[in-house]
Amino acid sequence: MRKVKIGLALGSGAARGWSHIGVINTLNQMGIDVDIVAGCSIGSLVGSAYACGKLPELESWVRSFSYWDVLRLMDLSWQRGGLLRGERVFNQFRKIMPLADFSHCQMPFGAVATNLSTGRELWLTEGDIHLAVRASCSMPGLMAPVPHNGYWLVDGGVVNPVPISLTRAMGADIGIAAVSYTHLRAHET
């Protein structure tokens, strides 16, 4: 009998997305083995660290944040298509994850970005993982778009904020969606 493959989709959500670290730790404590991970925006950053075996290092870095550390990571830019360049954050990410290729992942991983030319999502599953995460996190207006193969890429949350469809396309039989944004509200009657 074939093992059921479990996919984990880590959604967008800005700083709330750090909660994905807790979701992963809880799944591990419950004995739920994830086979495939996909992420969008902050979910791609956390998901890539998890897929590459670097989640403890990322968690340690995040837990060390002070208010002032967060402010120091903000590198304002008025020229590159976004309020922030994002280089300080992603330089730190590169220190945590020095291996830059999807082939270094211990499990299949994919990131979702949005192609500005077509308005469609782009699934990034091979090549430069740093570029994929940077593109997936590039919130329009806040961070500059990322050039890739003649196109400009921005945050995957524009079109697919919780990429459960990507986990399915990568072979997951069952999908677990981790949602950290608060756009969903209870409807009062």
What are these regions (language model features)?
Residues 13, 23, 43, 111, ...:
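Conserved small-residue
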Residues 38, 112, 174-178:
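Hydrophobic/aromatic beta-strand patches that form the interior of the parallel beta-sheet core
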Residues 70, 97-108:
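A short alpha-helix-loop-beta-strand transition element characteristic
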Residues 90-96, 108-113, 120-123:
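Charged, glycine-interspersed solvent-exposed loop segments at helix/strand-loop junctions
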Residues 115-118, 149:
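Short acidic-glycine loop/turn motifs at beta-strand connectors
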Residues 182-189:
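Conserved small/polar residues in nucleotide/adenosyl-binding loops
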